[in-house]
Amino acid sequence: MKEQEREAYEYANAMPRNLFKALADFQQEVPVIHKGTTGYGYTYADLPAIFEAINPLMKKHGLGFTQLMQGTSLETRIFHVESGEYLQSFADIPQDVQLKGMNNFQVAGSAITYFRRYALSSALGLVTDKDTD
């Protein structure tokens, strides 16, 4: 086997196949999550709405997630419960943002919540849209 073929073989066998299959199955079933919260001049799907939509399907497909702060970065980890395979991403949370009428702790909490929503949505391939009902 040539070196390049061996590297390709090793890479393919190191892929988190169980996680990828479970994630693909999850993505086929997860609904569009409606944006039902308004704030700061725009409409968005809040974390409770996202959790309500994804948690039963994540359990069904053997998936879980964690979101932990690592210094000023948010680590989002999507994992396959049985195999332990995981994907992770990091998002740096800006520290120099100021919002009118909010103290530094409120701004930090708002930023963390904002990044949690978007990091989780991105990692899971979620789609959010305005509720037209």
What are the language-model segments listed below?
Residues 2-133:
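Polyanion-binding surfaces on beta-sheet-dominated domains and ring/shell assemblies
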